[in-house]
Structure formats: C-alpha cells, structure tokens
Amino acid sequence: MRQALLERFLRYIKIDTQSDGKNLESPSTPSQFEFAKLLKLELEELGFHRVELSDKGYLSASVPKTIEGVPCIGFIAHLDTAPDFSGANVTPQLINDYDGSEIKLGEDEVLSPELFPHMLKYLGKTLITTDGTSLLGGDDKAGISEIITALHYLLEHPEIPHGEIRLCFTPDEEIGRGADHFDVPEFGAQWAYTIDGGQLGELEFENFNAATAVITAKGNNCHPGTAYGVMVNAQTMAARFHAKMPLHDTPEGSKDYDGFFHLINMQGQTEEAELTYIIRDFDLELFEKRKTWLTERVKSYNADLVLGSLEIEITDSYFNMKEQILPYPHIIDIAEKAITNQGVTPLIKPIRGGTDGSRLSYMGLPCPNIFTGGHNFHGKHEYICLESMEKAVDVIIDICKLTAEEQQA
C-alpha cells in the first residue's frame, strides 16, 4: 500500500484547492469541485459503492458491510487547503532516510530541526516537504489519501469482518463552512472520525468554543484642511481600542488549554473602520465571559468618546465537541486501541482550533479527530512523514475491524 499511498498523495497535492472565505457559494472555489469530480471517478474505478457528488461539492461513498449487526461508521476529510499561503504549483521534495540535518527549501528557505525539533523524531524516515514557495497541502489531502487507501484495502479483502463504512470529502473546512451542507441522516453513520490531525498518534476530541467579533468604528470625515474639531478618524479609534487589548491574551501568548482574542483583520478609512477578532476558549463559561468582556469594553470605550462610536457584533462559530463525544466513550476507546495496536502511543490532546467534526458532533454525528502524520500546516515549512501516513492507514483499517469485534463480543 505504501507506493499507492505515496503516488495518490503526490497526485492530489498538485491540484490547487484553496478555499475563499469571501465567496459565499459552496464550494467557495471551482477547483474544489473539479478535485471532487476527479476523486469521484477514482472511487468509481476502485469499486466503491454509492459514490455521490452533491451540487454543493460533498463527495460520499461506501464500502459494503461484510457481516450483519455492526454499526455503520464513517471517515471524513476535506477537499480545500488553507487560503493563508499559496497552494498553487506545489513542488514536493522527497527526503529518503532523513539524517537530522536541515532541509533546503528552494533557494532561500530551510526546514531546520533547530526551529522544528520534532523533525528529529523522523530519523531514517521518508519526509515530504515543500520547495519553499507554497504549502504542501497535507491538510487535508493526506487525510483523503489515507482514507481512500485504507478503504480500498477493505474492498479488496471482503474476508475482513466489518459493517458498512462511509466516507465523505467536504469543501471549505478551512474557512469554517465544511459542515454547512453536510447531510447527517443521508450519511447514515452512527459515528465518524475526521482524518485531519497532525503528528503521529494524535487523537483529539476537545476543541475550542469559537466566535467572531466584528467591531465597527464610526467616524466623521471631512477635508483635512478644515478638520479641526470636526473630523473623527475611525481608523485612529480602532487602533486605540486594539492597543489596549491584553497583550498576553493572544495566540502567541497562549498554549495548552488557554483561550485568546486574535485580531485577524483591520481595515477602514477615516469615515469607518473595522476590527475583526476571533474569540477562543475550551471552557464554555470562560468563553461566554470573553464575549461579555469584549462587549463591555466597547461600551466603556464609547462612554469616553465625545464624537464617534464603536459597534460590536458577535457570531458564534462552533463549540467544543467534548460535550457531545464523552457520552459515547467507545468511540474514543476504539480509536485509542487502534492506534496502540500499531505500536504508537496515543497523543490525546485538545485541538487549538476546530474541525468539521466539532460542528458535526453537534449535528448528531459524534466525530473525533485522528492524525494524518503532518506538521507545520498552512505554510511553506509544512512537511509530512510517509511512515506516519502508513500508520494512519493501518489505524483506519483497525478501527473498522475493532468496531466489528466489539459488536460481536
């Protein structure tokens, strides 16, 4: 399976499928739909059943059950890559028998174990890197490659007992819309796993509670030559507001179970300016306190203004899936055992972000997240270990086996 997995992955990452948060259509970019069409043809040629591509860009398929009485489970990955960094003209480098040295990425960049010490875990392994001009696309084309490789193996080995297995590849996960048009009843699984994690062994069923806050500064524009006592510069108002945000309460100042405020966009002119923050916290009570605190800060800021004003609008994005998964401990137990069976120590940790699984869990499909084998997603230093990808394939296969064994026990 190693060569098929590698060839599949290298083929997929050459297709630029960045999503576009400014486009409200689904998928947000035509390239995602074209990629889904190619995958549909591949799944049909490989013998998958019920291969269907929706008009919103969701591709689903099935592996038929080989025994009765076993729950239908699913595996999910996403078609898009992050809009944060170029996904075009991906030129991967294969580093066989990695020796622990820094890896040159094109002419000007390096991938160094001094900056990324986790590279030293992969001595003697095969690494796949970028050439420094793009992201790699392992998030989540590694997940797609691993799911197809694993489930094709099960198709070719009907002697292995398992229930019906569903897969779905979703668009626009990177812009938070991957679950928008996901049809949970049609998918038909009792639970699922997103294959969208990072390093070898990761198993995640906690994620941030998430919201977006848009703060609009309302100023007053006029000719600068006659501005005295009249002009109110909305950009200055916005800048002063942000300057008084807590310095430690940011992504770069937080880790583990810490939450944060993150200014992701600042734009405007004299008349009107806009600050966009994302709000994150694992604890629901602290999450609500963060939203209240920011709202009160706006009110307090307005109270000190003579001219101009700030307005705030907060929209919830997703919630911590832990609350929806803990009532079904067997979902985690099976995945943990499958990882352990491969000689890998499960790395159970919170996701400092979100996945399709977080929203799907609240839509009635409990859906923890499993590793792909990659590191440094969304940038030019992204890399993935081929042997870790192989382990992910083995974990997927073993989850299907263990689900059947548990039901028969």
From Swiss-Prot:
Q: Which reaction does it catalyse?
A: Release of the N-terminal residue from a tripeptide
Molecular function via GO:
metallopeptidase activity; tripeptide aminopeptidase activity; zinc ion binding
Q: Which GO terms describe its cellular component?
A: cytosol
Which Gene3D superfamilies does the UniProt record give? 3.30.70.360, Zn peptidases (3.40.630.10)
Swiss-Prot/TrEMBL keywords = Aminopeptidase, Cytoplasm, Hydrolase, Metal-binding, Metalloprotease, Protease, Zinc
Task: Please name the CDD domains in this protein's record.
Answer: M20_peptT
Q: What biological-process terms (Gene Ontology) are attached? A: peptide catabolic process; proteolysis
Entry superkingdom? Bacteria
Q: Which residues bind Zn(2+) 2?
A: 139, 174, 378
Required co-factors: Zn(2+)
Where in the sequence is the active site?
Answer: 80, 173
Q: How is the cofactor bound?
A: Binds 2 Zn(2+) ions per subunit.
What does the entry list as the binding residues for Zn(2+) 1? 78, 139, 196
Protein's cellular compartments = Cytoplasm
Functional note: Cleaves the N-terminal amino acid of tripeptides.
Member of which family?
A: Belongs to the peptidase M20B family.
| PANTHER family given in the database record | PEPTIDASE T
Q: What is this protein called?
A: Peptidase T
Query: From what organism does this protein derive?
Result: Shewanella sediminis (strain HAW-EB3)
